[in-house]
Regions:
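C-terminal interaction appendages of subunits in large macromolecular complexes
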Residues: 1-146
Length: 146
């Protein structure tokens, strides 16, 4: 029931992104296609959001690529589409680069987790959806005592 009342954010390795109403997945069949993908594409993240997350538009999407680029943009820039659509461009990628990770954070968030590391959300530059990512040192500053 929680799925049907939520909105899902899909992100693919080729940089496509879309919001899909959870109600679209209500079916009597056991298996359904969740999204349309190109032959060389795959889903790297599905994030369950509440309707209020999407309606208020205050959340921020963060995308990280395998080549170390990052891009942040408002969730309000992501279109709500049907599950059968491919999505809209979330990030402009270089030829061999792909999206490695996606998350949604509150704009005031200081950090987020990726591969067991705490990264600094404030170092992800806010730009428009579909922009090129930028190199950024996202490692959290830590103090070490010797």
């Amino acid at each position: 029931e929680e799925l049907f009342e939520s909105i899902l954010l899909f992100v693919t390795k080729n940089g496509y992104i879309k919001l899909v109403s959870g109600a679209e997945f209500e079916t009597g069949r056991q298996m359904i296609a969740a999204t349309k993908l190109d032959a060389d594409d795959e889903v790297v993240g599905v994030i369950m959001l509440s309707a209020s997350d999407v309606l208020t538009g205050t959340k921020k999407v963060i995308l990280l690529t395998k080549d170390g680029l990052s891009l942040g943009f408002p969730l309000s820039e992501v279109s709500e589409l049907k599950k059968t659509s491919r999505g809209v461009k979330g990030i402009t990628l270089e030829k061999e680069d792909t999206v490695a990770f996606a998350t949604v954070v509150h704009p005031a968030a200081e950090t987020f987790e990726y591969e067991g590391k705490t990264l600094n959300a404030r170092r992800v530059r806010n730009r428009k959806r579909a922009a090129k990512g930028q190199k950024a040192n996202l490692m959290q500053n830590t103090l070490t005592l010797e």
